[in-house]
């Protein structure tokens, strides 16, 4: 249970280790990252079992997350060698202009519990590839996955001080977070978590004008038009909505279905949800595990109660599961309207609220009626509609006829109050680098 002083020690260790790491050729850093990737994949089963025991997601999902998390290490091992600058035509006959990229410095990474491996590697891998040391504060609920990753990183050859893990209790999290965001030695803060906490960290970081990346809350719309393949839409919704018990920032939270296919879609969804197996994550047939804690369970109950009081109907689930603890039944709500909490707040649970809409423009208006703008999904077979809706939705990412969109090769991030910056892809490396402009005179 570390505190502010322990955090300062970790920052000092990162500061001291930085010069040697940044001086290494990119190819050497890439080699270390590649060895880390290999070790993570060699220990995929061990890491998955640890994750399931610590966080609760089904073992099959945990295995998938380990592979997904490792993909960022592999990707940025390759991108480390591609931190290209620019040569720009000079503004005078004797002028030459060059732009180079340099590592920004000590990075603070604050990560969530819902993806305790992937959210760390998605930040640490590009930072290390760029030549930066990192201090990671993992979520209080899932410190063990972070420590396991650090052990493997050390075995891969990451030098002492380059990857530092600061674990703490919920009581000490505010002081650790404040130290990371206010220390002049930290030049970059990367945070994944709730929008209110992101705003707090942003305010704290402003005192030293740090570069900040924020991947915050989402309340993703999932739109089903009347020309869609309904079976494909149900499959996509199941993958997006109930994965990780609905505890993902990009999961479908507001399902908008066009009136002409609404009833048929509800019946198809009920059939699919009825096949979900709720249970302990280490049991082989489990599709849905428990919610992370009692507060999460209480929020799900509150959202369902609010919806039913305002006229929504529970057509499946709606209760705590017979298994007890924080298990909850996969739930479907119909006749949901925009004035309910499920429309304005991120539920973060296994609840699928179905809204009805009439026209394309109405669907766009309803989908954009949110302070969040992380992800969106829609199903249609009309190419004109696909382009129009994709351009009109106010989100950073859109799944078109697809319910799973995350990949290391594409930029992950949102707009509006869902965050700043992008993770993954070739753009992810730039988040940990500074541009430096060199003007050479007297070149004639």
What spans do the regions from the language model cover?
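Phosphate-binding beta-alpha-beta segment of Rossmann-like dinucleotide-binding domains, i.e.
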Residues: 61, 72-93
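Conserved C-terminal structural/oligomerization subdomain of aldehyde/semialdehyde dehydrogenase
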Residues: 1-2, 186, 223, 277, ...
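Generic secondary-structure signature for well-ordered alpha-helical cores
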Residues: 16-23, 38-45, 56, 78, ...
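Residue-level signal for inorganic ion chemistry
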Residues: 14, 29, 51, 73, ...
């Amino acid at each position: 249970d570390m505190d502010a002083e322990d955090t300062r020690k970790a920052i000092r260790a990162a500061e001291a280790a930085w010069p040697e790491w940044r001086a290494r050729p990119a190819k050497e850093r890439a080699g270390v990252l590649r060895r880390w990737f290999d070790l993570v994949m060699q220990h995929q089963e061990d890491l998955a079992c640890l994750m399931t025991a610590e966080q609760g997601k089904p073992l099959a999902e945990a295995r998938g997350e380990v592979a997904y998390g490792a993909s960022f290490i592999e990707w940025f091992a390759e991108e480390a060698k591609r931190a290209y600058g620019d040569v720009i035509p000079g503004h005078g006959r004797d002028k030459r202009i060059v732009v180079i990229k340099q590592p920004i410095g000590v990075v603070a990474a604050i990560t969530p519990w819902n993806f305790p491996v992937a959210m760390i590697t998605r930040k640490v891998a590009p930072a290390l590839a760029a030549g930066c040391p990192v201090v990671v504060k993992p979520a209080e609920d899932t410190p063990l996955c972070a420590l396991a990753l650090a052990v493997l990183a050390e075995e891969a050859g990451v030098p002492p001080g380059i990857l530092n893990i600061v674990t703490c209790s919920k009581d000490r999290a505010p002081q650790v977070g404040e130290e990371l965001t206010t220390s002049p030695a930290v030049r970059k803060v990367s945070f994944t978590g709730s929008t209110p906490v992101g705003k707090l960290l942003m305010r704290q970081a402003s005192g030293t004008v740090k570069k900040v990346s924020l991947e915050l809350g989402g309340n993703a719309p999932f739109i089903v038009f009347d020309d869609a393949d309904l079976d494909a839409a149900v499959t996509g919704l199941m993958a997006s909505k109930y994965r990780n018990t609905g505890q993902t920032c990009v999961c479908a939270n507001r399902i908008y279905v066009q009136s002409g296919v609404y009833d048929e879609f509800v019946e198809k969804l009920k059939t699919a949800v009825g096949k979900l197996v709720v249970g302990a994550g280490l049991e082989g047939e489990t599709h849905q595990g428990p919610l992370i804690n009692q507060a999460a369970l209480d929020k799900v109950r509150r959202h369902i109660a609010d919806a039913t009081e305002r006229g929504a109907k529970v057509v499946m689930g709606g209760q705590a599961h017979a298994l007890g603890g924080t298990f909850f039944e996969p739930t479907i709500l119909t006749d949901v309207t925009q004035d309910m909490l499920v429309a304005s707040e991120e539920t973060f649970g296994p609840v699928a609220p179905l809204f009805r809409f009439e026209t394309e423009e109405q669907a766009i208006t309803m989908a954009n009626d949110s302070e969040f703008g992380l992800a969106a999904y829609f199903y249609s077979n009309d190419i004109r509609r696909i382009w129009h809706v994709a351009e009109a939705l106010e989100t950073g990412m859109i799944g078109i006829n697809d319910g799973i969109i995350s990949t290391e090769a594409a930029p992950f991030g949102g707009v509006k109050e869902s965050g700043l910056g992008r993770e993954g892809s070739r753009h992810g490396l730039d988040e940990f680098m500074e541009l430096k402009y060199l003007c050479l005179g007297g070149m004639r």
